[in-house]
């Protein structure tokens, strides 16, 4: 009789078999099951000396779809897939179970072979048998369908993510066209005014007082910074949350950076008659941080505070030496606050409150702030009550003395 060696099911090309008795041995990589698998293989090899059958070994780690197809809950497991009905042997006594079932399996094999002989007479005109193939082929096809189903699900998720990114980019392009117009117009007016009043021969500005010249130069500089900040924020967030965030940490006096940013945004909160209250102790320790990155955080948080605080409202800025290793900074406003159900989501990329859909912005500012603070091994969070404003807090490491 033809004897079949042990075979490993190919991960890419499952083996199709016509053997009358077909078995699948499911194994895993656990050291505890290794000895049991070796004993099962040895016993099957003894049986192969006398009987015709085929065993295919399947590593569940490499082919989980087959394990899912047979709904296996434990390994090792030995499955008779042909002739039908299918039967699963599992547990610590597989060899004992095999000895018990083997005679009945042989009876089923004899019955199958007898049926094959009887059906040899049923041939079509081209000499092809009409007996369906009941082999590992059906198992492989089912497993492949499961794998393809999982792959389709994964691709659908990727497609949804890409569509979300495309929608975000479309929204950003539309918003950029709107939001960039204001600072561009302001900068252009300031520069054109300076240019039209500049005398090349004398090298002086005509009809402009020194204070007005300084104001126009500051206006042009501030507006170009606004444009640069918009573009920088978009590029950094567009890289994705898993992208490495480069930092150049150094000794920073954050209180001074706070005051510089407040001065930069002075025109904005002054235009809304907003009061700015600062409480930054003079003995606040230096922090270990990237000044440009932290400046981005301060600009974003203060920009939001100005945007959402009504005219005549108050913005508060404070610093606190929380521990020997951390310094906490806080920015509060008297705006509408943040609903409780949205406090955990406001740091998500592209997330915006429904009430803010009509306001300028891209839903990336707080996400960017969180990425920067986390990159500094700090924390950022919000305290808020509806109609009572919001307080944003973040911590940074103290510069080691």
Swiss-Prot record:
EC number in record: 2.7.13.3
PROSITE patterns: HIS_KIN (PS50109)
Catalytically driven reaction(s): ATP + protein L-histidine = ADP + protein N-phospho-L-histidine
Superkingdom as given in the UniProt entry: Bacteria
Gene Ontology BP, a term: circadian rhythm
Keywords in alphabetical order: ATP-binding, Biological rhythms, Kinase, Nucleotide-binding, Phosphoprotein, Transferase, Two-component regulatory system
PTM annotation (Phosphohistidine): residues: 178
GO molecular function, one term: ATP binding
Record-annotated Histidine kinase domain positions: 175-400
Pfam family, one: HisKA
Subunit record text: Homooligomerizes. Interacts with KaiC. Participates in the KaiABC clock complex, whose core is composed of a KaiC homohexamer, 6 KaiB and up to 6 KaiA dimers. SasA and KaiB(fs) compete to bind to KaiC.
Functional note: Member of the two-component regulatory system SasA/RpaA involved in genome-wide circadian gene expression. One of several clock output pathways. Participates in the Kai clock protein complex, the main circadian regulator in cyanobacteria, via its interaction with KaiC. KaiC enhances the autophosphorylation activity of SasA, which then transfers its phosphate group to RpaA to activate it. In addition to its output function, recruits fold-shifted KaiB (KaiB(fs)) to KaiC to cooperatively form the KaiB(6):KaiC(6) complex (independent of SasA kinase activity).
Domain remark from Swiss-Prot or TrEMBL: The N-terminus interacts with KaiC, while the C-terminal histidine kinase domain autophosphorylates and is probably responsible for self-oligomerization. The N-terminal domain stimulates the C-terminus to autophosphorylate.
PANTHER family listed in its UniProt record: HYBRID SIGNAL TRANSDUCTION HISTIDINE KINASE C, TWO-COMPONENT HISTIDINE KINASE
Name of the featured protein: Adaptive-response sensory kinase SasA
Species this chain originates from: Nostoc punctiforme (strain ATCC 29133 / PCC 73102)
């Amino acid at each position: 009789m033809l004897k079949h060696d042990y075979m490993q099911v190919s991960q890419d090309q499952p083996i199709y078999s016509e053997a009358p008795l077909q078995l699948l041995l499911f194994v895993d990589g656990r050291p505890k099951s290794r000895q049991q698998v070796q004993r099962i293989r040895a016993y099957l090899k003894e049986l192969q000396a006398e009987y015709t059958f085929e065993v295919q070994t399947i590593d569940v780690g490499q082919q989980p779809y087959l394990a899912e197809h047979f709904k296996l809950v434990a390994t090792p497991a030995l499955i008779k897939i042909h002739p039908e009905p299918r039967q699963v042997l599992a547990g610590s006594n597989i060899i004992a179970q095999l000895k018990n079932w083997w005679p009945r399996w042989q009876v089923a094999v004899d019955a199958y072979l007898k049926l094959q002989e009887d059906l040899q007479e049923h041939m079509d005109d081209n000499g092809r048998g009409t007996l369906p193939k009941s082999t590992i082929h059906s198992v492989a096809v089912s497993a492949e369908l499961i794998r393809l189903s999982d792959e389709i699900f994964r691709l659908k998720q990727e497609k949804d993510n890409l569509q979300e990114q495309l929608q975000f980019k479309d929204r950003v392009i539309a918003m950029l066209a709107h939001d960039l117009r204001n600072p561009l117009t302001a900068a252009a007016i300031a520069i054109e005014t300076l240019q039209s009043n500049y005398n090349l021969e004398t090298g002086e500005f005509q009809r402009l007082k020194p204070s007005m010249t300084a104001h126009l130069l500051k206006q042009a500089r501030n507006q170009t910074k606004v444009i640069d900040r918009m573009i920088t924020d978009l590029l950094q967030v567009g890289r994705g949350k898993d992208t490495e965030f480069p930092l150049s940490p150094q000794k920073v006096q954050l209180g001074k950076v706070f005051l510089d940013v407040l001065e930069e945004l002075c025109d904005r909160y002054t235009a809304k008659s907003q009061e700015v209250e600062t409480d930054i102790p003079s003995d606040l320790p230096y922090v270990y941080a990237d000044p440009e990155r932290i400046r981005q955080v301060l600009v974003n948080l203060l920009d939001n505070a100005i945007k959402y605080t009504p005219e005549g409202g108050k913005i508060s800025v404070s610093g606190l030496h929380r521990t020997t290793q951390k310094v906490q900074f806080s920015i509060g406003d008297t705006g509408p606050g943040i609903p409780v159900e949205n406090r955990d989501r406001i740091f998500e990329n592209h997330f915006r409150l429904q009430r803010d859909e009509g306001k300028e912005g891209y839903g990336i500012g707080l996400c960017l702030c969180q990425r920067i603070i986390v990159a500094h091994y700090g924390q950022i969070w919000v305290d808020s009550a509806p109609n009572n404003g919001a307080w944003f807090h973040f911590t940074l490491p103290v510069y080691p003395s």
